């Protein structure tokens, strides 16, 4: 039983499910990097609402990695005609924090 518990805990950690996102830090990152000029939690502004992003990618095991790519390098055509600009000045850790946080915002 102990082995099963350890295995389950290890799988949860490896999958990222047990990884808690620091919401306050993520919101501060979003504010400081201009994300909230185009996005909000529940309403479309210029870009999609974070809840819509969550809904679109919720079943994608690579969602966080995809979002990291879009935040770092920008993207075109995923959410309409207006492209998302790249954010090359953000650290990889900050980008990952934002991507993980976005995936916690449910409709």
Regions found by a protein language model. Name each.
Residues 46-57, 72-99:
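Axial heme c-ligation environment in periplasmic c-type cytochrome domains
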Residues 56-66:
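Short microdomains enriched in Cys/His and/or Lys/Arg
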């Amino acid at each position: 039983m102990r082995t099963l518990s350890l295995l389950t805990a290890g799988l949860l950690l490896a999958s990222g499910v047990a990884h808690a996102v620091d919401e306050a830090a993520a919101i501060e990152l979003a504010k400081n990097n201009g994300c909230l000029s185009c996005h909000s939690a529940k309403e479309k502004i210029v870009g999609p609402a974070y809840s819509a992003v969550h809904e679109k990618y919720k079943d994608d095991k690579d969602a966080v990695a995809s979002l990291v790519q879009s935040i770092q390098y920008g993207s075109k055509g995923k959410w309409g005609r207006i492209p998302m600009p790249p954010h090359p000045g953000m650290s990889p850790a900050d980008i990952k924090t934002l991507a993980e946080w976005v995936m916690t915002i449910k409709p």
